[in-house]
Structure formats: C-alpha cells, structure tokens
Amino acid sequence: MGDVEKGKKIFVQKCAQCHTVEKGGKHKTGPNLHGLFGRKTGQSPGFSYTDANKNKGITWGEETLMEYLENPKKYIPGTKMIFAGIKKKGERADLIAYLKQATNE
C-alpha cells in the first residue's frame, strides 16, 4: 500500500487542476472523484463523459486505478483525460492510497 501523504502531494501536483475529491466538490475539467472506489467508469453524476468512459464498464478499485493511471488513453481509448499517466508504480500506489482516503471522507 502506498503513502497517503506522498499521494496527496502527487494529487496536488498532477491532478488537482482538473479534479476535486471532497464530498459535494464541483466538477472541473475532470469529474469530482468523491465516491470513486466501487463506482463504475463514467458514472459521476452531472459530469459529461465520453462514450468510451461510459462504456468501459469496469469498477474503480486499486487494481483498475493502478492500470488506468499508468496510461489513461491506452486503458480507455477515447477518454478526454489528457493526462499522460504516472509511469512509476510507487507513485501510482501513493496516489491511490491518497485517493482511497480522500474520496471517502
């Protein structure tokens, strides 16, 4: 399992410009991520997803996020997420540890 504090720094540096995590947080360029774990792709209420995201049909969890965050466009071809991904597995684990906590508070 990753380091939550390191993951928070990664989120602030690489994700926060497009995503919020708190309950009731607004959508930005990307959707609010509250309640992410256990939710299917393309299901955050009020966000306009691509058909690719809606039709992927996987449920977000540690393993699916680990694969997705390495290369989002490869995992969901047609996603509008323009982020290139995080190549280092340890950094992805840290980010996922943070997301698991922050999106559930």
From Swiss-Prot:
Protein's UniProt keywords contain DNA damage: no
Pfam families: Cytochrom_C
In-chain residues carrying the UniProt-annotated modification N-acetylglycine: 2
Listed name of the protein: Cytochrome c
PTM note: Binds 1 heme c group covalently per subunit. Phosphorylation at Tyr-49 and Tyr-98 both reduce by half the turnover in the reaction with cytochrome c oxidase, down-regulating mitochondrial respiration.
Chief location bin: mitochondrion
Phosphotyrosine PTM positions: 49, 98
